[in-house]
């Protein structure tokens, strides 16, 4: 039997060896709520005081419908409002894409549809949120997250296809209340004597719907999202910012950004434009939101809010019929092709109906026109003898900004996307080839495909010099796929596997000449995200810029720059 002293010495040596072996791994992880490194209640209280009492102890919105904090009047409000996207954007404990609120373990959810006695799990909703109302409060929150090694989440509206606006055991900076809008008749770039004409500066929390209303009152519009509840300064613009049809006319949102005001990982406020910190400015115009810092204000070009005539050509048919694709769908794409050549842009949509049929439409916008009959005449002339198989309607818009709904519903959807080149789309056989390949994708009930019109100014904006994949400069259309996610247990995982393994290969097959996607509408499990979103050269440059500005990866976004160094939820390096 060993002497007691020797036994204790050996045990202490063993424990020390284990600690030294595990310490590097532990130091490469973010702090979790059950660990000693987690901030004390006193630390959170001090933070709350520094944030002017804007720190929120966060719970899922459905928690008021469950024991032990059941509050029936509050529950009734949540049930009534939960399908309103505009309402959800103002709730730090909710997301527009609501299935990302749930965790990936068994029953890690807090559902409005389950009984009040059922457990309400925190899921992927952060534990605390800094509901910031000033740049200084953003700086305070960033410094706190850095000092305490917390998993930091940036949340604007919750329009996010990859789950980056939420995360378990995380600390959220909620930018929704940074809602200032300032119009400039002739904006001067900060740090230079260069004036660039009309522009608008917007706070991080401004919604496109509100910006369109404000712009409509002053006679301007920006190249922005089709949904009123998308944030104008957040991940949409920082991810590239693809409008439905205005990109063809004025370029992407990122092309039109003049400067960013951003709080970096050190907590400093930086103004980035073409003359100041041009590396960061380049990265922010397509490198992805929540990656290089917290954008608190963005300034972008504005354009006249034109009147327009909107024309819709639609068809419904049997997806099993070859002629539906070779004539009906190809015809709709041919209309878009023909009008694009004339400078008129639009969008194509295809959807599965509950009756088992397929519906499809092409919407085109004739800018600076007011006569409906003139637009309808152009459409019928373009369709020729085939016009009889379609329903054609046109209506005049007083302004482009008026063509956006005030609200958008909650969604449970996954996205995928691919680019179609000019070479394919503009070729004589392009529309038929695309229609034929589209017929192989296989939509389920309620799923749909839509295009965003590129070409035009998107191709001509090479001077804008953004980090998006070089193929954007020679592409005609972005084709996006929207996949419904059931609320049943395990449905999200099944939908993700179907998207990655079955649907995305078929989507990429639309144009075999390239394999390029758009991160804002991309597969959240895209295995080749570096190559398809940015391309190897741009990605390497983005990684270097991130190392320069955020060497400790305080800002990590799923399938974002540097995310390959971290696990699924961004907690531990891999």
From Swiss-Prot:
It is an enzyme of class 1 (oxidoreductase). InterPro entries: BBE, FAD-bd_PCMH, FAD-bd_PCMH-like_sf, FAD-bd_PCMH_sub2, FAD-linked_Oxidoreductase, Oxid_FAD_bind_N. Keywords: FAD, Flavoprotein, Glycoprotein, Oxidoreductase, Signal. Pfam families: BBE (PF08031), FAD_binding_4 (PF01565). Glycans are attached at residues 48, 107, 193, 368, 385. FAD-linked oxidoreductase; part of the gene cluster that mediates the biosynthesis of penigequinolones, potent insecticidal alkaloids that contain a highly modified 10-carbon prenyl group. The first stage is catalyzed by the nonribosomal peptide synthetase penN that condenses anthranilic acid and O-methyl-L-tyrosine to produce 4'-methoxycyclopeptin. 4'-methoxycyclopeptin is then converted to 4'-methoxydehydrocyclopeptin by the ketoglutarate-dependent dioxygenase penM through dehydrogenation to form a double bond between C-alpha and C-beta of the O-methyltyrosine side chain. This is FAD-linked oxidoreductase penH. It comes from Penicillium thymicola. The gene is penH.
């Amino acid at each position: 039997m060993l002497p007691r002293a020797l036994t204790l010495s050996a045990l202490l040596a063993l424990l020390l060896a284990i600690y030294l072996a595990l310490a590097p791994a532990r130091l490469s992880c973010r702090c979790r709520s059950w660990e000693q490194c987690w901030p004390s209640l006193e630390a959170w209280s001090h933070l709350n005081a520094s944030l002017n009492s804007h720190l929120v102890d966060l719970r899922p919105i459905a928690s008021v419908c469950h024991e032990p904090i059941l509050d029936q009047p509050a529950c009734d409000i949540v049930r009534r409002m939960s399908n309103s996207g505009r309402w959800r954007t103002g709730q730090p404990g909710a997301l527009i894409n609501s299935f990302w609120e749930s965790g990936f373990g068994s029953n890690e959810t807090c559902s409005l549809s389950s009984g009040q006695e059922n457990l309400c799990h925190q899921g992927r909703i952060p534990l605390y949120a800094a509901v910031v109302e000033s740049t200084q409060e953003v700086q305070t929150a960033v410094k706190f997250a850095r000092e305490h090694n917390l998993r930091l989440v940036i949340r604007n509206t919750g329009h996010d296809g990859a789950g980056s606006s939420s995360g378990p055991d995380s600390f959220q900076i909620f930018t929704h209340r940074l809602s200032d809008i300032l119009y400039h008749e002739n904006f001067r770039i900060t740090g230079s004597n260069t004036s660039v004409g009309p522009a608008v500066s917007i706070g991080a929390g401004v919604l496109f719907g509100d910006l369109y209303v404000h712009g409509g009152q002053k006679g301007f519009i920006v190249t922005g999202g089709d949904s009123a509840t998308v944030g104008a300064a957040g991940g949409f613009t920082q991810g590239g910012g693809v409008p439905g049809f205005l990109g063809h006319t004025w370029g992407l949102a990122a092309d039109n950004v003049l400067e960013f005001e951003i709080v970096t990982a050190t907590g400093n406020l930086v103004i980035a434009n073409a003359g100041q910190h041009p590396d960061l400015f380049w990265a922010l115009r397509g490198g992805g939101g929540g990656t290089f810092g917290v954008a608190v204000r963005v300034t972008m070009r504005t354009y006249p809010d034109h009147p327009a005539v909107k024309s819709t050509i639609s068809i419904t048919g049997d997806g099993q019929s070859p002629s539906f694709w070779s004539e009906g769908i190809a015809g709709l794409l041919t209309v878009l092709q023909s009008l694009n050549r004339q400078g008129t842009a639009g969008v194509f949509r295809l959807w599965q109906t509950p009756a088992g049929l397929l519906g499809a439409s092409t919407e085109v916008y004739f800018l600076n026109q007011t006569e409906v009959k003139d637009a309808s005449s152009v459409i019928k002339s373009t369709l020729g003898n085939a016009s009889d198989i379609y329903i054609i309607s046109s209506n005049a818009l007083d302004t482009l900004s008026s063509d956006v709904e005030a609200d958008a519903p909650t969604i449970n959807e996954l996205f995928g996307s691919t680019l179609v080149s000019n070479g394919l789309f503009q070729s004589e056989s392009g529309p038929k080839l695309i229609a034929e390949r589209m017929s192989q994708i296989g939509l389920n009930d309620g799923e749909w495909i839509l295009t965003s019109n590129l070409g035009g100014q998107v191709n001509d904006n090479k001077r804008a010099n953004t980090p998006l994949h070089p193929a954007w400069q020679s592409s005609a259309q972005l084709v996006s796929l929207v996949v419904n996610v059931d609320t049943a247990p395990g449905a999200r995982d099944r939908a993700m596997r179907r998207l990655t393994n079955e649907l995305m290969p078929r989507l990429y097959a639309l144009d075999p000449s390239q394999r390029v996607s758009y991160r804002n509408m991309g597969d959240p499990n895209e295995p080749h995200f570096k190559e398809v979103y940015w391309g190897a050269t741009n990605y390497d440059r983005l990684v270097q810029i991130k190392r320069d500005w955020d060497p400790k990866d305080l800002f990590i976004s799923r399938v974002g720059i540097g995310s390959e160094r971290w696990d699924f939820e961004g907690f531990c390096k891999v």
